A protein has these predicted regions:
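Hydrophobic helix-and-loop "lid/oligomerization" segment in the mid-to-C-terminal part
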Residues: 2-123, 142-145, 192-441, 459-464, ...
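Conserved phosphate-handling catalytic cores of large alpha/beta enzymes
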Residues: 109, 114-117, 124-141, 145-207, ...
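A contiguous loop/helix-start segment that scaffolds small-molecule binding in enzyme catalytic cores
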Residues: 231-240, 245, 448-534
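Residue-level recognition of well-ordered beta-strand positions that form the cores
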Residues: 266, 512-514, 548-550, 567
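OB-fold and OB-like beta-barrel modules that bind single-stranded nucleic acids
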Residues: 420-421, 496-497, 542-555
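Short nucleic-acid-contacting surface segments enriched for D/E, G, S/T with interspersed K/R
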Residues: 528-548
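OB-fold/S1-family single-stranded nucleic acid-binding modules
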Residues: 555-578
Length: 579
């Protein structure tokens, strides 16, 4: 097992200071990161075109023009549009209910769907998308329809574009880590100024959820501030109801971790795999003026009764998530067969080619699952035939190693792919058939040995005397971690006797560190793996084990004890020793 200490620990620093410095924060920003204030927020007027956009929208409302809002198909898109419509409903309830229509994508698609725009529309508003759709903007403009774009995606400035574009990537706005919902919030702040109201801050919960789901960099202090403020006061009916259903897991603790695991995935499941009816139900449940309406119950055994729309929505989201997991399981069987038939596992990078098309919405989830199961960088590619031109395209997932710091860039630099777009370790990729075969040969030559993960750890702990306190201390700061400020990873090295090791129910490995209250657990540990581990004890008096993992506080029957959630471990040597 390979690991690297990010920076030597300095005694003058607290563990939190050390971690935040390791994440690239300047020393003078650490206190501001931990407790951000409104001083971190930038003036919304720094966004180009924001006044023009606000006045254009208000003028359309005052003149009772028909307005269409295009909802983008991900969590950031849904929260962006929900924020805008909820805010406008506070100001102009009759206008929103009578003159503003909105549209959802039937499939996972981004940008304007011109065919869905009602014929009497005079203004189109697109939160979280469409900055690069110049031709659509021109087409609408020629038909007398103006566009307001409230977006954060990269696009080139085109002076011929008739749309009013508010985009932090296309101007000198200092914070590039605001997602679409952040831009909509800034837009509503300007509307507040014009209308002399103060409604925008009431929707910061949607801002927080959207930015967390869209993986915005929390090292940007404005982004951190808006997220912290939003999570302090959850008001949105859908988020509240979903939290109630997941209260055992969330435990009233709203932070980037709980939002990422127990809120955003349910929204994304519906946007990816839901029917149009399910998507409409979800979005309506995010609207304050729709969520608490009584609707005919769809609950089993409750025919003829009514229930709140938001309750129905949350239950439906759970059903869609379960359906998605079932579909994922069925598709995994196809992938396992392909791995066996193609002997893909013989290579140290899994390249899996599937003749039949998969649900594009599941590609990334499947690649991530296979990478985790096989412990190898993974590409899942499906055959595409466009007008007789064959390509292999799909999703790639990787992890940091000593040789490769960025898998997307590595594949791009190989010169064999048509494209590799996305994040360093999660991205879309495409090849021609000829170049794919060349890429396979290149990979096999480059990585003759198994590609070992290289864990970058914040601390190396070997002192039993301080271990319990160190773990409890670091675990108590869980609310501070987020995108680009990842949860600290620690490395422990201790010697274990056979009685310190146990396999609990449901495949949970438990290692109890002698002389401490600390236990280390790993989920999904197989009986065969456990048998092999136990046999090593027969060769000596104990095992010296290195463990890489995350700090946790185990709460049971009112008692709290330090715990390490194991990410990986290795037996360094068999030893003879005296406890």
């Amino acid at each position: 097992m390979n690991y690297t200490l990010i920076e030597p620990t300095q005694r003058a620093r607290s563990v939190v200071e050390q971690v935040l410095l390791n994440r690239g924060l300047d020393a003078d920003k650490i206190a501001r990161y931990i407790e951000p204030t409104e001083d971190e927020a930038f003036d919304p007027h720094l966004l180009d075109n924001i006044i023009h956009a606000a006045k254009t929208l208000l003028l359309a409302i005052m003149n009772q023009k028909k307005i269409y809002v295009q909802i983008d198909s991900d969590c950031d898109g849904y929260t962006s549009s929900a924020l805008l419509l909820n805010y406008l409903h506070r100001l102009f309830p009759s206008t929103v209910e009578n003159n503003i229509a909105y549209g959802l994508h039937s499939k996972k698609h981004h940008g304007i769907n011109i065919d869905d725009i009602p014929l009497d529309t005079q203004l189109v508003v697109v939160p979280d998308a469409s900055s690069n759709e110049v031709e659509f903007h021109k087409q609408l403009f020629e038909n007398g329809i103006m566009c307001i774009i409230l977006d954060h995606h990269h696009a080139e400035v085109d002076r011929t574009d008739p749309a009013i574009i508010v985009n932090n990537q296309m101007c000198s706005y200092p914070n590039k880590a605001l997602s679409g919902v952040g831009i909509v919030y800034k837009f509503c702040c300007v509307l507040d100024e014009i209308m002399r109201t103060s409604y925008a801050d009431g929707y910061l919960d949607l801002v927080a959820v959207g930015m967390i789901a869209d993986m915005m960099d929390m090292r940007e202090l404005e982004t951190r501030y808006l997220t912290v403020e939003g999570l302090k006061d959850i008001r949105n009916p859908f988020i509240l109801e979903l939290a109630k259903k997941n209260e055992y897991k969330i435990k009233d603790e709203f932070n980037p971790f709980t939002i990422s695991w127990y809120v955003a995935p349910f929204i994304n499941a519906v946007t990816r795999s839901g029917t149009m009816e399910e998507k409409q139900l979800l979005f309506k449940s995010m609207l304050e003026y729709e969520a608490y309406r009584l609707v005919p119950s769809t609950k089993r055994g409750c025919s003829g009764s009514e229930e709140l729309l938001v309750e129905q929505s949350v239950r439906t989201c759970g059903n869609v998530k379960s359906r998605q997991e079932k579909e994922k399981k069925n598709t995994l069987d196809i992938i396992y067969n392909a791995i066996q038939e193609q002997n893909s596992n013989a290579s140290n990078v899994l390249i899996i080619q599937l003749e039949q098309s998969l649900d594009n919405n599941l590609n990334g989830l499947l690649a991530n699952h296979i990478m985790g199961e096989f412990g190898k960088p993974t590409l899942i590619l499906t055959k595409r035939d466009k007008d007789g031109v064959i390509t292999w395209e799909g999703s790639a997932r990787g992890y940091q190693t000593k040789e490769v710091e960025d898998w997307r860039q590595f594949i791009m630099d190989s010169g064999y792919c048509m494209y590799a777009e996305g994040h360093p370790f999660a991205f879309g990729v495409g090849f021609t058939p000829e170049n794919l075969e060349d890429f396979k040969r290149y990979i096999n030559k480059r990585f003759e040995e198994k590609i070992e993960k290289n864990y970058k750890v914040d601390f190396i702990w070997t002192d039993k005397n301080t271990l319990d306190d160190d773990i409890i201390n670091l675990a108590s700061y869980r609310h501070l971690w987020g995108q680009e400020v990842g949860e600290p990873l620690v490395m422990l090295q201790f010697t274990f006797k056979e009685e310190n090791v146990a396999l609990l129910g449901k495949g949970t490995l438990k290692l109890s560190i002698p002389g401490t209250k600390t236990t280390c657990i790993q989920f999904g540990y197989g009986e065969e793996e456990y048998f092999n581990l136990r046999t090593l004890f027969a060769q000596g008096e104990g095992l010296n084990i290195q463990i890489v993992g995350y700090c946790r506080i185990n709460e049971w029957n009112g008692n709290c004890s330090p715990q390490i959630e194991i990410k990986d471990f290795s037996v360094e040597r068999i030893v003879g020793y005296d406890f």
